[in-house]
């Protein structure tokens, strides 16, 4: 069986503390203040996370509705890698364990009251097989209504070694989820800056693909290097603009697999959940939106636009504009 999915090369622990992006700064960059003043926090919105799993971190406040393990078939929630937990924390960690002396939760996620359904399809090394991902997609479609899933975050990308049939199967699966009312948010991958470097399933015409706004730095971590302008770029082979939206993704501090800890990671894997959290806020305001309507709202709300910042995309996520 071909190893078709992998954590991306630059999803590394970045150790230079002076450049850490705390979640409160992320939320300032994407302009969340008006949304929070409106009382939006993601409550009663369910986000599915397809990744390495999720640890029972205290920041998740018993909001993990269901955990399904397609790798080892374990029943209790766990994350033997940490990537999925980090992603979930960006989307909706409460920040409980990050209070400063003033009581401010520095590391709360974008939508800190969302509920989670977590599908473990990647192993402890961040690798997976296409069959597990497809099983996860089938499970999600069968249980979408039971858990009222509105959003699916996929912060992984298919490797080039995957066969054409596997690629088509995955693209069909995410398109079907979209057709059934799930807003699919994917990472653009970290193979930029060359054109046509967006990973699958991010090349799908339907799904929303997210790149890193702050990828124009070069940092050295403990196990590798982030290349400058690492975010995957389009257009795709079918001349589709990808990624559509940019969000912060470099040196983001979020939940670790330790129940009380936090860790720093970088990559489009971190940018995608920023957008998933923002979409959760928007669904709280507009619960009847279809994925297509939400995607149009994102197109209309981004600022600055791509042409204003020299990027081939729609533009930068702007939450206040999104939730009006």
Regions found by a protein language model. Give the residues of each.
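N-terminal domain-start motif of subtilase-like serine proteases
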Residues: 2-48, 71-82, 226-234, 317-320
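Short glycine/serine- and small hydrophobic-enriched flexible loop segments
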Residues: 92-96, 138-139, 215, 276-284, ...
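C-terminal subdomain of the subtilisin-like protease fold in secreted/lumenal serine endopeptidases
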Residues: 149-153, 284-324
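Anion (oxyanion) recognition and catalysis
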Residues: 41, 175-179, 246
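Substrate-binding/access-modulating region of protease and related hydrolase catalytic domains
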Residues: 121-206, 237-240, 256-272, 310-314
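Solvent-exposed loop/turn segments at secondary-structure junctions
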Residues: 53-55, 70, 97, 122-126, ...
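Extracellular S/T/G-rich loop segment that most often corresponds to the catalytic His/Ser-adjacent loop
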Residues: 51, 202-284, 288, 321
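Subtilisin-like serine protease catalytic core
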Residues: 36-47, 54-66, 75-131, 148-150, ...
